[in-house]
From Swiss-Prot:
Gene3D superfamilies: YVTN repeat-like/Quinoprotein amine dehydrogenase (2.130.10.10). This is Protein TOPLESS. The modification Phosphoserine is found at residue 214. It is found in: Nucleus. WD repeats lie at residues 353-393, 415-454, 460-501, 504-545, 548-591, 595-634, 639-678, 710-756, 766-805, 833-871, 874-914, 917-956, 967-1005, 1010-1049, 1060-1102. Residues 286-305, 1100-1131 are annotated as: Disordered. It comes from Arabidopsis thaliana. Transcriptional corepressor. May repress the expression of root-promoting genes in the top half of the embryo to allow proper differentiation of the shoot pole during the transition stage of embryogenesis. Regulates the expression of PLT1 and PLT2. Negative regulator of jasmonate responses. Negative regulator of auxin responses. Negative regulator of multiple floral organ identity genes. Required for ovule development. The gene is TPL. Expressed in embryo and in extraembryonic tissues. Expressed in inflorescences, flowers, floral meristems, developing anthers and ovules. Detected in the vascular tissues, shoot apical meristem, cotyledons and young leaves. Expressed ubiquitously in the pistils, stamens and pollens. Residues 4-36 form the LisH domain.
Amino acid sequence: MSSLSRELVFLILQFLDEEKFKETVHKLEQESGFFFNMKYFEDEVHNGNWDEVEKYLSGFTKVDDNRYSMKIFFEIRKQKYLEALDKHDRPKAVDILVKDLKVFSTFNEELFKEITQLLTLENFRENEQLSKYGDTKSARAIMLVELKKLIEANPLFRDKLQFPTLRNSRLRTLINQSLNWQHQLCKNPRPNPDIKTLFVDHSCGPPNGARAPSPVNNPLLGGIPKAGGFPPLGAHGPFQPTASPVPTPLAGWMSSPSSVPHPAVSAGAIALGGPSIPAALKHPRTPPTNASLDYPSADSEHVSKRTRPMGISDEVNLGVNMLPMSFSGQAHGHSPAFKAPDDLPKTVARTLSQGSSPMSMDFHPIKQTLLLVGTNVGDIGLWEVGSRERLVQKTFKVWDLSKCSMPLQAALVKEPVVSVNRVIWSPDGSLFGVAYSRHIVQLYSYHGGEDMRQHLEIDAHVGGVNDISFSTPNKQLCVITCGDDKTIKVWDAATGVKRHTFEGHEAPVYSVCPHYKENIQFIFSTALDGKIKAWLYDNMGSRVDYDAPGRWCTTMAYSADGTRLFSCGTSKDGESFIVEWNESEGAVKRTYQGFHKRSLGVVQFDTTKNRYLAAGDDFSIKFWDMDAVQLLTAIDGDGGLQASPRIRFNKEGSLLAVSGNENVIKIMANSDGLRLLHTFENISSESSKPAINSIAAAAAAAATSAGHADRSANVVSIQGMNGDSRNMVDVKPVITEESNDKSKIWKLTEVSEPSQCRSLRLPENLRVAKISRLIFTNSGNAILALASNAIHLLWKWQRNERNATGKATASLPPQQWQPASGILMTNDVAETNPEEAVPCFALSKNDSYVMSASGGKISLFNMMTFKTMATFMPPPPAATFLAFHPQDNNIIAIGMDDSTIQIYNVRVDEVKSKLKGHSKRITGLAFSNVLNVLVSSGADAQLCVWNTDGWEKQRSKVLPLPQGRPNSAPSDTRVQFHQDQAHFLVVHETQLAIYETTKLECMKQWAVRESLAPITHATFSCDSQLVYASFMDATVCVFSSANLRLRCRVNPSAYLPASLSNSNVHPLVIAAHPQEPNMFAVGLSDGGVHIFEPLESEGKWGVAPPAENGSASGAPTAPSVGASASDQPQR
């Protein structure tokens, strides 16, 4: 339906409301689906008119449209069911269960069973989750609060919750104006016209000899001037505009450049009176990291407008309590992908987990499987999609702040969060550029593999840098940028010297498109006011000035052969356009059809093979043949795409990168692309046969079974994460032979002398009894320890000539740090026995706060000032383990000594959920932000997996213990997730094990034999390649995580003085550096902290043991804990 027809419905709704046709108003709201009357909906819910509630909702959404819709219908039907139970109307309750609630059983069978069991209770409030259910009135009110949040968050209700601002009786006014026009056209207008009907046009009868008065004196006509006839408002179309002036040719200036700017002209027909910008949509409980953007006004600040979705953000980012239900990924209203031509990439071949939301992507111009990615938190990643390996990951950092302008320094202090707006390769792939949302452009040189180096950093624009591109005017490689300061700038790519500044836009410049034709180099630019301008490299001003369809965010691109020009734009009210331009005439040649009525974000597009156009819209990828305006096909990528996904073809068009929800990138492939990726798999399997990684295979199975197809397996094999298996394409047969020779002489690396490694005992200004907890800060420049006497110790490395990075190192001692006030961070101990207390802490992502407890209240400390910000949750029960939610620092999982886990919201000071599944105190908690689960472990040696959407327990398993050891013997069991977020490490005094999460299956296990000392603690290295484990006899062992085989042993004599060699001093805790995979630290039972690194000449801890019998593991997948010496490598 056209926008004017839609507005006509609003006028009719206003008219009906003013005339008190109340039932008809709501019927039209429902049938048109244009306006959801929240007040009416609330009234019907409060009155319990459930049939009318669902009937009204059906005009806007269906049960299975998306997660929000399903949750809305579920809550309504659940309330209806509970009210029937409350009235003891069992037949009605059964009827509701069978007819209304049964549909949800396919999505959550356990929940449906639990609801069914309520029938067996005399009072459903006996169910713990419903124990606080009050009376019907209050329950409806509580439910309504949740329903409103869900409706506001639901993309299907976008633009439907706000009635347009209209003057009273707007429809009557328009009719009167129409009658005025009709009367003005009468040949013999009467002074007091008699309007008898609206069904036909008005016309005055003969004057009977009377002279008609002037229209100016006619009170009906007022002061309206005489005008020609106007065509009527069509039922489904806009007014026809008057003809535009003949447009100036876009290409005319190319053959004979002129310094005189052409007059501004229209790019085509202008729709009369387009719909106004909707009111800003509210985002309920949106996490702080959410990259969503409300509809901005025309003069709003342009920060990351190019890439952030308008209105409601992707479903995964909304902080609404959802049912743990998944849906098929079929895009709304699109047919399946079977109609797509074979040469379109339509098969999901890879799914990569980037870690933050992709905002821009670009394939290498030569290496067809090398993908560059920029994200909403300023990260850049370089992926080899063939092997699913992330070669490089870099976070945003200003290289030299002293050279930055004061506005930039002030902007970074005020708002340190920086997004990537665009990443792009140079034509030969030797450089790539990154444009950020704050002033900065960074250029890197690329030398193959993971070798990228800093090249240039340019403080390019005041405000955001919205686009970046490369061009070669006069055969000199240049970088073109544009920004919020309304300028386009050209920089020398070798030196960073500014060559040109183009000024003339009156709004922030959104995109640039350099090109050349007939030996003339030029640049197209688009701005947020919809203006398209063209520039020569001569500083003589813009050569053309056109209006882009949509008149807001527009990008331009040529076909691969440079002969056809296209643009893609999205207007402020969400209407999107892809058009082809006639360059010779400067006019739109064709407009492609098939966009959603209101795009849910700024649409991105790309071209391929000189034949196809593609755009990300409506949770899908839409394709057009360049020569036909009709939509060719739409592909949903097996579901899970963003509302307006970012897309990018590789140069051959065989692969298409598409951004999805939950920070993933899907790689779509055609038959050529699949063959290309298959060659990587063959090469990888051949070059890595001695190191087959069973865990990587299990990761794939885990991801699939969890409904995250390929999401977890994509993070590369555990064997290859440290660079050992990278660039497998370049592996020569001689390397395999060399490896075989080494395997014959491999032996365990023993470190027994201080000279065999770099170790350092940290200086001690304050003596403590023993170190109970230990962690490196996330920045990697400090270590935080919690002692058994509830005091925190902090050591910081200083940046100086000997330590240019300021990072932790075993080569230089740090300073034990305290604020000038001299205060200590000391936990509340209440009346607890220090020996019985279980100390625990958790550090925030930005290292600013630490949450800590030592048997008493939980304390929140400021890490800069050591001040206590808050204390809460006095015992009993006492906290025994703390973990921050990975997506929201305000949510904390707290393990308690009464065996429960409390999900606590710091902001509102409220326990949201209490999880029960263990029988003894909680000793470990770990979140997976890929699988959306929490894994817990306890002193009962039990492992539990909890869904973080509804906090239901998914499965549990008791850790197998050695024969002869009773399960009742208390011992801490700790858990830590692998980098792939699909596997986790289990640490018990009797064993190390790696488990697959979704099935809770043990994939690898290393057991402590009876003659050996127990394990005290263990942790993954930062890249999950290694496992560091400490033992009661003071040895520290380093294992390869791929197979849990021992590769290096650090004996006590290497770091403990001789005076302590016969004592009982040993490591209680061990911590890995967050960026250096071969650095770790231990906290000792005598209160000391030691940091370890291998010798610089070695660079790593020993050599991975060779494969046995063609396997990466010399042990069975899950040997018994009591395995004999022949089953286990010696320690």
